[in-house]
Amino acid sequence: MADQLNGDMGNLSLGSPQPGQHPGQQPTARSYIPPHMRGKMSAPGSPGSPIASPPMNSPPQPGPGSSPMGGLNNSAWAGNNNFDARAGGGGNWSGGYENGPGPQPWGGPRGGGGFNRNAYRGPNAGGGGGGNMGGGVGRGEGRWIEGKHVIGNSDPRLERDLFGTADDPSKQHTGINFEKYDDIPVNPSGRDVPEPVLTFSNPPLDAHLLSNIELARYQIPTPVQKYSIPIVINGRDLMACAQTGSGKTGGFLFPIMHQSFTQGPSPIPAQSGGGYRQRKAYPTALILAPTRELVSQIYEEARKFAYRSWVRPCVVYGGADIGSQLRQMERGCDLLVATPGRLVDLIERGRISLCNIKYLVLDEADRMLDMGFEPQIRRIVQGEDMPTTGQRQTLMFSATFPRDIQMLAQDFLNDYVFLSVGRVGSTSENITQKVEYVEDVDKRSVLLDILHTHAGGLTLIFVETKRMADSLSDFLINQNFPATSIHGDRTQRERERALELFRNGKCPILVATAVAARGLDIPNVTHVINYDLPTDVDDYVHRIGRTGRAGNTGIATAFFNRGNRGIVRELLDLLKEANQEVPAFLETIARESSFGGGGGRGRGGGGRGRGGRGGNTDFRKYGGGGGGFGGGGGGFGGGQHGSGGGGGFGGGGGYGGAPQSGGYGGGYSGGYGGGYGNPGGAGGQSWW
């Protein structure tokens, strides 16, 4: 017995397959896989099988069995098969080796280090260490050599992954209906505003960027892109307001990529401390956004337009494995997309320096500043080593820019151009808006009627609470509707999985809280249902903006009852502004609220971002906004020399103007202590 046991033990080896493991497959530890590293197929004939790592300091082994992903499994739930990025220095095999056609350049001044078999198409796909001027070259990547942009070889597999095919439902192909946007008003303001461009052409855009734009099937620039491209190329700061789905992401990515392709990388500064310099990232462009989903989406767009170029995009956000994000940055980080919290964390760890930043972008800037991100933003912009205002370009993009946010933005912008495109802070006429009067107890039955009637396409349902999101999705599943949900209590992996199922149509109904409301570009959403209306009409605008994107059409249905009367006036104005049908019950409740004093955030004619002079107007041009004739408070006050916004009829006081003209609490109301709504009427309450 002992002899048999010894014999069995002698036959075991580290390479022996484990129970349930295919022969030749490496043992793996399950770990989080970010969305940009998922769905990558291994080589034909060996699905899911990782390729054994070549020995240290030896060239990679090209051949039919190699995998461009270093063996990452094609399952969204699979482990990240022995991802062992080595940042070490040392060996003599400094360059990468491309097993495609043609000779490949060897390692540059920052090459060196161990062979990294799992480098994700980074600049050191062949060698460790690295930055954007040295190391190896992965497939689909270019380089900057001696002042010239060397375009990389094509990679059909990566190209298909990035751009899809013409009939791929998971990829959005824009440029279809933008000809209809030619009559949309565009209002630039500022000193010496450059003339807009009318087409994607060279000049002004780099020829390689144009080829990537063509691969993405963009045909003509959107209104915001027509103006933002020449404004940024001419070195100006920009504050851009444009309706949701109007191409804001391209509005900042196109000119930044163009400048990067023509000017090349900034030199790495001399650093004391020796051997850790290669482990710190020195991006030249920083894009900040408020949510994990939005930064992932911007990153995927950046990958498209950086294809075959020297620019290496990276993404960092909370809720994901920080180790994999650090390894990605070590392989080159020229354009960084980040959430503020994770970026501050990495700065504190000494892994990111902002001293080379040429371009700072704040996407969904109003939400980041208005909802509590201001301290983190100010620390990143003003408290670290980022170049000061005037030494960098700062771009702010969003669908709404209320006047108080514009005033805060002055600290980040220098001699900027304010760009208002279309009905900013409003909704697109491409969206057909319907408002139905539905009591809370009837919402489920009415929802079922709508889903039966509007079968087909993707339907996004917004609710107010996490509990309701799970409850409603379970109810729909029990009614034989393929549904899933997304909210803040679900893990990052669960949220990304739910979004993927929704995007590819396997679960065409998504129930969501506000976590998915802003910025997410989900193609082919044909119907948005506000099961629970938000208390802020700006949130309503962003919710329904998930459909009707990129010039296409969509339907937005809202369930309204008297519990939502706090936004009735603004909702009414919104419908009229977008030439939508206004139901009679909405007019009736609006009149009741005007004279009966319903509480809530009634913001009148001079209100925040809507009506007369609001969030789509450059506040530098005008003074104070007056109060509205409604139950809500008065409008926001004006600029430095404007008068404070007075209270509306029956309403409490509005915000005042700038400190020079009375500060918050200008007008008659006496500041924040004024009524929030109508203190004397039904439903009114003090702000405090």
Swiss-Prot record:
Domain-related comment:
The Q motif is unique to and characteristic of the DEAD box family of RNA helicases and controls ATP binding and hydrolysis.
Ranges of compositional bias, category Gly residues: 87-99, 124-139, 595-615
Q: Which organism is it from?
A: Chaetomium globosum (strain ATCC 6205 / CBS 148.51 / DSM 1962 / NBRC 6347 / NRRL 1970)
Q: What is this protein called?
A: ATP-dependent RNA helicase DED1
Q: Signal sequence span per UniProt?
A: none
* Residues annotated as domain Helicase ATP-binding: 229-419
UniProt subcellular location: Cytoplasm
Q: Where does ATP bind?
A: A242, Q243, T244, G245, S246, G247, K248, T249
**What residue intervals hold the motif Q motif?**
198-226
Give a GO cellular-component term: cytoplasmic stress granule
Q: Where is the composition biased (Low complexity)?
A: 17-27, 42-51, 66-75
Q: Give GO BP annotations, semicolon-separated.
A: cytoplasmic translational initiation; negative regulation of cytoplasmic translational initiation in response to stress; positive regulation of formation of translation preinitiation complex; regulatory ncRNA-mediated gene silencing; spliceosomal complex disassembly
The protein's matches in PROSITE patterns, at most eight in alphabetical order, are given as: DEAD_ATP_HELICASE, HELICASE_ATP_BIND_1, HELICASE_CTER, Q_MOTIF
Q: Which Gene3D superfamilies match?
A: P-loop containing nucleotide triphosphate hydrolases
Q: DEAD box: where is this motif?
A: 363-366
Known function: ATP-binding RNA helicase involved in translation initiation. Remodels RNA in response to ADP and ATP concentrations by facilitating disruption, but also formation of RNA duplexes.
List its EC numbers.
Answer: 3.6.4.13
Stretches the record annotates as Disordered: 1-141, 593-623
Q: What family classification does the UniProt entry report for this protein?
A: Belongs to the DEAD box helicase family. DDX3/DED1 subfamily.
One GO MF term attached to the UniProt entry: ATP hydrolysis activity
Provide this UniProt record's keywords sorted from A to Z: ATP-binding, Cytoplasm, Helicase, Hydrolase, Initiation factor, Nucleotide-binding, Protein biosynthesis, RNA-binding
Return the Pro residues bias intervals: 52-65
Catalytic reaction(s) noted:
ATP + H2O = ADP + phosphate + H(+)
The Helicase C-terminal domain sits at: 430-590
